[in-house]
């Protein structure tokens, strides 16, 4: 099969390209720019385009299917050529569904935690040598790619993103998967550029629940009232399995899970991660992993990439980075670090980087998100606001949104970096939360602070 990727450089797209290349398909692709790690990984498999840009001559009748990435625009010249020739065009999730129609589809959804839960499940299955197909949104230890597709595996585990499928298919990705087994971890308003109200956003999870296969199993976080309302009121003929935060305690900076077999030390921490663990346990049981085998394997799970990831640590200081950027994630991450390192000063730094977080109307959602920190810092780039074609937000608007009088706000990368490297980190927990890079922050240099 000949497959062409329009926007091959995306995190998910390049991993799918590699997975299909490994499956023996002939792969080509284009993009106007590709950054690492996508660039070096595509190069490793000889899939990196020889030059960047869009080239309609790449689209011929010899191509069986074009996979269209969200980064491309509706007027992309390669897309227009494919439409003109009548070449089959599909979105990323549409293609994944086509590849998994005959498998048991396990889909992990939710505004937060879906990458971590998917990663936990894959870690457990890998630990016990159980082969499954998968698609996950982060690089995992022990897994070469973020996408794996075979003919023979019975299960496929899919991270169910609620963002749109492609420029020509405006359905949320997770609406296309039609799961046999599903999970919803939580609902907190996000992606306001496509879901302008919370009710509109919440409706997408109702549609997801209703899209499940008749007789399927829904695992859900019963402590999230929006999730519970949607699942428990669903008239779809599905089995419902609620979960909640398991019993645990923290001793000397280590979180212990209370089980019938004794107290189990974990490498992860935070109430949100313990909820994630409870959800992953239910899913694994549906996939044939019993409770004892789950506990044996979860003890060695250290977290998904960029999720409360330790950059550096010594006996009195820890530096962490986290992908948190939405209000609910920022709040959960800040509270988790505060509870885990109670006797240390907590410095919490947040970069406002996404479309939603830089939107003046959405900023109020961050009220109280950094309250658990001893020292709270926000960095944002006015240039990023300009690129996203949003109205500029002022420091006063940000201060008002967080409702914290001592909030430190930086808009200049050098000033923020100077502040950071000027801190005395003795007996401190420093957490850096962003989906960006703080204007080019040198994380390797940051390690030298302790």
Which sequence ranges carry the predicted segments?
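ATP-dependent carboxylate-amine ligase
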Residues: 1-37, 42-50, 62-66, 82-87, ...
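Fold-independent oxyanion-binding glycine-rich loops
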Residues: 8, 30-31, 69-71, 92-93, ...
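Phosphate-binding loop of NTP-binding sites
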Residues: 19-23, 57-58, 70-220, 226-237, ...
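A conserved, hydrophobic alpha-helical segment in the catalytic core
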Residues: 20, 175-189, 228, 262, ...
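Beta-strand->loop->alpha-helix junctions that form or flank phosphate-binding loops
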Residues: 51-54, 90-97, 135-138, 234-252, ...
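The start of beta-strands in P-loop NTPase/AAA+ ATPase cores
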Residues: 132, 154, 180-181, 216, ...
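Short polybasic amphipathic segments
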Residues: 254-259
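Short pre-catalytic strand/loop immediately N-terminal to key active-site residues, enriched for Gly-Thr
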Residues: 264-269, 317-321
């Amino acid at each position: 099969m000949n497959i062409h990727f329009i926007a091959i450089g995306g995190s998910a797209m390049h991993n799918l390209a590699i997975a299909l290349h490994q499956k023996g398909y002939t792969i080509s692709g284009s993009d106007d720019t590709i950054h690492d790690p996508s660039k070096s990984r595509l190069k490793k498999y000889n899939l990196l385009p020889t030059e960047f840009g869009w080239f309609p001559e790449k689209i011929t009748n010899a191509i069986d299917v074009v996979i269209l990435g969200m980064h491309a625009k509706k007027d992309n010249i390669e897309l227009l050529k494919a439409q003109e020739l009548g070449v089959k065009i599909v979105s990323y999730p549409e293609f994944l569904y086509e590849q998994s129609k005959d498998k048991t589809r396990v889909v992990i959804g939710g505004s937060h935690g879906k990458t971590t839960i998917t990663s936990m499940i894959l870690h457990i299955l890998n630990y016990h040598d159980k082969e499954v197909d998968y698609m996950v949104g982060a690089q995992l230890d022990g897994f070469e790619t973020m996408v794996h597709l075979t003919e023979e595996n019975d299960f496929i585990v899919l991270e169910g993103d609620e963002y749109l499928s492609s420029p020509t298919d405006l359905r949320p990705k997770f609406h296309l998967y039609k799961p046999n087994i599903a999970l919803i971890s939580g609902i907190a308003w996000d992606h306001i550029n496509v879901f302008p109200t919370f009710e509109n956003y919440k409706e997408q999870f109702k549609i997801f629940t209703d899209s499940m296969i008749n007789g399927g199993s829904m695992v859900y976080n019963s402590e999230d009232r929006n999730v519970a309302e949607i699942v428990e009121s669903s008239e779809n003929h599905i089995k419902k399995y609620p979960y909640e935060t398991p019993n645990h305690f923290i001793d000397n900076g280590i979180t212990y899970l209370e089980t019938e077999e004794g107290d189990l030390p974990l490498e992860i921490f935070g109430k949100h991660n313990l909820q994630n663990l409870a959800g992953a346990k239910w899913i694994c049981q549906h996939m044939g992993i019993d409770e004892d085998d789950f506990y044996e394997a979860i003890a060695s799970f250290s977290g998904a990439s960029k999720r409360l990831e330790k950059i550096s640590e010594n006996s009195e200081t820890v530096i962490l980075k986290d992908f948190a950027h939405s209000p609910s994630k920022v709040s959960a991450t800040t509270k988790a670090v505060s509870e885990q390192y109670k006797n240390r000063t907590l410095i919490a730094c947040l970069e406002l980087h996404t479309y939603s977080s830089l939107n003046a109307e959405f900023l109020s959602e961050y009220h109280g998100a950094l309250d658990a920190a001893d020292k709270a810092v926000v960095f944002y780039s006015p240039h990023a606001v300009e690129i996203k074609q949003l109205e500029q937000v002022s420091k006063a608007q940000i201060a008002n949104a967080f409702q914290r009088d001592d909030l430190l706000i930086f808009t200049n990368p050098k000033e923020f970096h100077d502040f950071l490297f000027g801190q005395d980190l003795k007996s401190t927990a420093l957490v850096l939360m962003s989906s960006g890079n703080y204007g080019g922050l040198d994380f390797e240099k940051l390690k030298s602070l302790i």
